[in-house]
From Swiss-Prot:
This is Pyruvate-flavodoxin oxidoreductase. Its EC number is 1.2.7.-. Keywords: 4Fe-4S, Electron transport, Iron, Iron-sulfur, Metal-binding, Nitrogen fixation, Oxidoreductase, Repeat, Transport. Belongs to the pyruvate:ferredoxin/flavodoxin oxidoreductase family. SUPFAM superfamilies: 4Fe-4S ferredoxins, Pyruvate-ferredoxin oxidoreductase, PFOR, domain III, Thiamin diphosphate-binding fold (THDP-binding), TK C-terminal domain-like. The gene is nifJ. The keyword Transport applies. [4Fe-4S] cluster 2 binds at C706, C753, C756, C759. It comes from Rhodospirillum rubrum (strain ATCC 11170 / ATH 1.1.1 / DSM 467 / LMG 4362 / NCIMB 8255 / S1).
């Protein structure tokens, strides 16, 4: 028997470790927060790791979760042992197959990271809404409450499914368990083999669908038999709970860890009991233990097997003394008398009474409550509030806990000061920025510390849906025994703030305990930092007697080649200051972790990290705390000029205090105001650009490529420029068009800039003698004050009239962007396209946005980057689902066309009472897209409303409501390649086949960027991505040529960094085309594995190597010449030049040179064949054929 290991891993890895080893086929699709399980399975399969039978499982990615369920269904029908991993909307797509699998009594186990379902809004965070939507599918539902349980009960689920023939849905709470890192004991292959009966595997094989012993399954049945067939499965469900318990007992015999279908924890004569499942059960159990030790007669029943629900087992778990029960559900079922678990408990008690199982026992009162929706915190203080409510003579029959419900008044009051954590647990909190490495370093820290046989660790990481550039908060606990505290730290003895600007924005010291240590990454040294701190921070440091240490981690990172990643430096400081383990030992372990973590990068990366570690401690400084307050007052989070909603709601969320907002503050239907990102001022850039007007050639390319619209330009009247302060540069406008005589003004919003440097990369204006550019990067501190003042002045300068501008790249940047300051990554390759759409058509723009990166940086609270013009018009934006975005956008078009048609009909009906010239003009220009014509049409609508005001009758009122639809609206359906190439492709294909006038923009990053970089069918040959770590062996799907085959679809392939003129031309032609348009836009991404400052040059290289052809296919040209125009240069460089720059290709080159050479050759052939076909379609003669013909 092999020896079991103690390891620090998260819930996803704990579960996947079992699922992979007891399966033969894993069919996967990425969705947060379950994706890691699929990623690990793919990685293990690529490495040749075997299951318990010595075979390497197949891991196959599908185009959607529905596809994954279908493939699993097929695999298990033919006798394989299958599994899949999913959550939320993905689980909903699997439900039809789940009914089939259960109805066919096919053993199967799926693992779910329980997550919120999208209702009024999407949420990636955890509750049990998705699992509860599956409770009538016929799947057994087994709940795990911790990382160890996610590991153990996965084996129970797989084993019990084989014996019971009931398929299992094994779940644990998304993020709270899936992403919590904890120290657990791993089951060995021998343990797992003892949990899986080979005879049952053979029986499953014997039932396989095969022509050797043919049967028919999946028949269509009629009323004479269907009902009876449904009831025929009853004995299997009746037997299932006992089978599950037998496997739990088998696990206990192997490992010593004992589980029950319902486990009771608490006083043996408890009078008040909570019933709960999932991670919250750990919080309740910990609180119960603490309160029972202090004399309370309380307890908790942990629900493990939710389906089939065993009345006998549940009643046996309840103390006979119980007088009041609170059932907690982590979901909301609107309109129901109660939530699912509550209803089951009430029903179980009624059934038990009818069966005499509780004869002579007083019936307890049962109340139901909701908690923890969308990962809302659930703490011991809230548990105490629930037990206090149960103690009342008339407790609330239905309640919520963790929020303030000032509308329906269901919420319980909570004493926030109630705490139960032991003093021997070390608690540390780290404030970082998404993609700065803080979270990764802290995960390594837990693993390093947990390697000690006497120390246990727990880590949990708080971040929003944005993957880069948002605040992350890491919560680490260490102690001498297993830690079961699935809630955030509220009293920390170590706090690290990795970005100095956070001190002005969030209450970093809110959880600081008396005497705690504060570590700051600071540009100020020990002698100057005190005066730079906000006054409230100084006050807290003094009041709580904090120890303060500083280090300029950014400077160390730059000097050691670490760029902007400060994680290793701050991690080293933590070990030096926290005392969790000896300093020298810690540094040695950090270096081991670095070597392991970056083994797939390069030795250069490893060496840079080593250098950073070695230089850190000499740069760490202790600060002597003065007894006086010298700091500045905290600036307001939003300015006084912000709208009421922004000041009263958005600002609270920006401060990290959104939990305090009451129910009454929330929009009831999920409708939120736009134009709120301008108040956020993230202020995260280390460097910002500075402009030398004398070197500027006024091309506006820098403004065009700015991903966050932080760099703007205006051409203003000379008299306005004359009034500008000396600190604000301007220069005479150099063009010969209508703007001649104006002053050219460039300005930057430093608090909205992310410091990506792409503007400098784009700048062609240079001093020929020195090579200096018109734009250069400077330390933020050197220029921020003047920049902020100049920005406010700039905003008040007059805008150029849109109607006076020809649609050129340069002129487009004089148009105010209505997409600004998003939460996208530094150097994002998607946002310039969206910004350009809003500059060109923003006041008439309707956007249907597929779920993905663009829906997160475009619609993730607390702010919206979409803005309004001076007239209050701007993009109307909505997100439906990942899979149906094309159809959703088509719905926009159908409604717009119907509204316009009805407006025209009403115009006709009211024409005798209206001006004939007005009516004719309105009808003739209802579909016009010309800028001047739009302005004229809007004036007509104003006149129409004036005339309608003098009319009576329903038709006049109806036309008033529809009049704006006589001005053409522009529909753009936007999303990424995961949507367009995979999950939404069927809908996209149907929409472009419909012939309707919609525009589709695919921002092609060639991976599922938002879920962490998994491969899509757009991923190119030779690239390593999650779900394809060994390098993709097949070429990228050619979406453009597929669309061109329709013949009636405008299709273009664009890359703004390589040809901004072609980009603008293609977008403009798409809008002008009266039919479906598809634009495929090259979008560089952090998932490509290089510094995105070089994104523009890499785009150009993509064109030069032929990797990304630029073209436009315009059906209007058919019959008069080739409809396809090739806009890019012919391939002039080997594609290897392009691939060598990106980490996604270099990983394969460095790890497996032989395979890389094979994939490179295949990529070169793919470029040749693709270009040959494009040249043929464009009617361009092959150069070699032309040469031979000339001979």
């Amino acid at each position: 028997m092999s020896v079991r290991k103690m390891v620090a891993i998260d819930g996803n890895e704990a579960c996947a470790s079992v699922a992979y080893r007891v399966s033969e086929v894993a069919v996967i699709y990425p969705i947060t927060p379950s994706s890691t399980m699929g990623e690990l399975s793919d990685e293990w399969s690529a490495k040749g790791l075997t299951n318990i039978w010595g075979a390497v499982p197949q891991v196959v990615e599908m185009q959607s979760e529905g596809g994954a369920a279908g493939a699993c269904h097929g695999a298990i029908q033919t006798g394989s042992l299958g599994t899949t991993f999913t959550a939320s909307q993905g689980l909903l797509l699997m439900i039809p197959n789940m009914y089939k699998i259960a109805g066919e009594l096919t053993p199967f186990c799926m693992h779910v990271t329980a997550r919120t379902l999208a209702t009024h809004a999407l949420s990636i965070f955890g509750d049990q809404s998705d699992v509860m939507a599956c409770r009538q599918t016929g799947f057994a539902i087994l709940a795990s409450a911790s990382v160890q349980e996610a590991h153990d009960l996965a084996s129970v689920a797989h084993g019990a499914s084989l014996e019971s023939r009931i398929p299992f849905l094994h779940f644990f709470d998304g993020f709270r368990t899936s992403h919590e890192v904890n120290k657990i004991e791993l089951m060995t292959d021998d343990d797992l083999h003892a949990m899986i009966d080979d005879d049952l595997v053979a029986a499953h094989r014997a039932r396989a669908l095969t022509p050797d012993t043919p049967v028919t399954r999946g028949t269509a049945q009629n009323p004479d038999t269907f009902f009876q067939a449904q009831e025929a499965r009853n004995p299997f469900y009746d037997a299932c709970p006992a089978i599950v318990q037998s496997y739990m007992d088998r696990l206990a015999a192997l490992t010593g860890r004992r589980y029950g279908l319902f486990d009771y924890v608490g006083h043996p004569q408890a009078e008040r009991v909570v019933v709960i499942m999932g991670s919250g059960a750990e919080t309740v159990a910990e609180t119960v233990d603490w309160l029972v030790a202090r004399g309370e007669k309380i307890g908790v029943v942990k629900v493990r097997l939710f389906r089939p629900f065993s009345v006998d087992a549940f009643v046996a778990a309840l103390p006979v003394s119980v007088r009041a029960i609170a059932v907690l559900d982590r979901c909301k079922e609107s309109g129901a008398i109660g939530e699912p678990l509550y209803l089951d408990v009430v029903g179980a008690l009624a059934r038990a009474k009818a069966l005499g199982l509780r004869a002579g026992i007083v019936d307890p009162a049962v109340i139901g409550g909701r908690y923890g929706l969308s990962s809302k915190e659930f703490t011991p203080a809230m548990v105490k509030a629930i037990f206090d409510e149960l103690a009342k003579a008339n407790p609330k029959q239905a309640f919520t806990v963790g929020i303030e419900d000032d509308v329906t008044h269901l919420s319980l009051s909570v004493d926030r000061s109630f705490r139960i954590e032991s003093a021997d647990i070390k608690r540390s909190v780290f404030f970082g920025l998404g993609a700065d490495g803080t979270v990764g370093a802290n995960k390594n820290s837990i693993k390093i510390i947990s390697d000690s046989p006497t120390i246990h660790g727990q880590g949990y990481f708080v971040y929003d849906s944005k993957k880069s550039g948002a605040i992350t908060i890491s919560h680490l606990r260490f102690g001498p025994r297993p830690i079961r505290a699935p809630y955030l730290i509220d009293e920390a003895d170590f706090i690290a703030c990795h970005h100095f600007s956070f001190l002005d924005k969030v209450d970093v010291l809110e959880t600081a305990a008396v005497g705690a240590t504060l570590l700051l990454n600071s540009p100020h040294d020990k002698d100057t930092v005190w005066d730079a701190l906000p006054r409230p921070v100084q006050q807290t440091i003094i009041d709580r007697d904090l120890k303060l240490f500083v280090i300029d981690a950014n400077k160390v990172a730059q000097e050691t080649g670490m760029g902007q990643r400060i994680n290793t430096i701050m991690q080293t400081c933590f070990f030096a200051l926290s005392g969790v383990m000896p300093r020298d030992e810690a540094i040695e372990e950090i270096k081991k972790a670095i070597s392991k973590t970056y083994a797939r990068k390069s030795q250069k990366v490893i060496d840079a990290n080593f250098a950073a570690v070695d230089q850190t401690l000499s740069r760490l400084q202790s600060v002597t705390i003065p007894g006086v307050l010298t700091g500045h007052a905290l600036p307001p989070l939003v300015s006084a000029g912000a709208p009421d909603f922004v000041r009263n709601v958005t600002a609270v969320m920006l401060a990290g205090k959104g939990d305090s907002l009451p129910v009454s503050a929330m929009p009831v239907d999920g409708t939120w105001p736009t134009e709120t990102a301008r108040w956020e001022k993230r202020d995260i850039a280390q460097q910002v650009c500075s402009w030398d007007a004398d070197l500027c050639i006024q091309c506006n390319k820098c403004v065009m490529v700015c991903p966050h619209a932080a760099l703007r330009v205006k051409a203003v009247p000379a008299e306005a420029a004359a009034a500008l302060p000396a600190s604000m540069n301007s220069t005479p406008y150099k063009g010969k068009d209508d703007l001649k005589g104006s002053a050219y003004v460039l300005a930057l919003s430093p608090e909205d800039c992310t410091g990506c440097g792409i503007c400098v990369e784009a700048c062609p204006g240079k001093d020929k003698a020195t090579g200096a550019r018109s734009l250069t990067m400077h330390a933020r501190e050197d220029v921020v004050s003047a920049c902020k003042e100049n920005w406010e002045i700039f905003l008040d300068l007059p805008d150029v009239a849109r109607t006076s501008l020809r649609p050129t790249v340069k002129n487009s940047q004089f148009m105010t962007p209505l997409f600004e300051f998003s939460g996208a990554c530094q150097g994002c390759g998607e946002t310039p396209y969206l910004k350009l759409l809003t500059q060109m058509w923003g006041d008439r723009l309707m956007i249907a946005n597929a779920t993905g990166c663009s829906s997160i940086y475009g619609g993730n609270l607390p702010t919206s980057p979409y803005a309004k013009d001076a007239n209050g018009r701007g993009p109307a934006w909505s997100n439906s689902l990942f899979e149906d975005n094309a159809e959703f956008g088509l719905g926009f078009r159908l409604a717009l066309d119907q509204h316009r048609s009805e407006a025209k009909r009403l115009l006709g009906a009211l024409a005798p009472q209206l001006s004939g010239v007005l009516v004719d003009g309105l009808v003739a220009n209802a579909a016009n897209n010309d800028e001047a014509a739009i302005a004229a049409q809007r004036e007509r609508v104003v006149s129409l409303r004036a005339e309608l005001g003098g009319l009576t009758g329903w038709q006049a009122r109806a036309l008033e409501g529809l009049a704006d639809y006589l001005v053409e609206k522009v529909v753009w359906i936007v999303g990424g390649d995961g949507w367009a190439y995979d999950i939404g492709y069927g809908g996209l294909d149907h929409v472009i086949s419909s012939g309707r006038n919609v525009n589709i923009l695919v921002m092609d990053t060639e991976v599922y960027s938002n879920t962490g970089g998994q491969q899509s069918k757009s991923t190119p040959i030779g690239a390593s991505a999650k779900f394809s770590v060994a390098g993709k062996a097949l070429p990228k799907k050619d979406l453009g040529q597929i669309a061109m085959a329709n013949g009636h679809v405008y299709v273009a392939s664009i890359a703004f960094g390589a040809s901004d003129n072609q980009t603008l031309r293609a977008l403009s032609e798409a809008v002008s085309y009266e039919g479906p348009s598809l634009i495929i836009a090259y979008s560089h991404c952090i998932a490509h594995g290089y510094d995105l400052t070089c994104g523009l040059s890499q785009q150009k290289l993509a064109i030069e190597t032929g990797y990304w052809p630029l073209y436009r296919f315009d059906p209007r040209k058919m019959g008069v010449g080739p409809a396809l125009s090739l806009d890019g240069v012919q391939p002039s460089r080997p594609i290897g030049d392009y691939m060598a720059n990106e980490g996604r290709f270099r990983i394969i080159r460095d790890a497996d040179p032989e395979r890389y050479a094979m994939l490179l050759e295949a990529a070169e052939e793919n470029v040749r064949s693709r270009w040959a076909l494009l040249r043929q379609l464009a009617g361009v003669a092959d150069e070699q054929e032309g040469a031979r013909a000339a001979q």
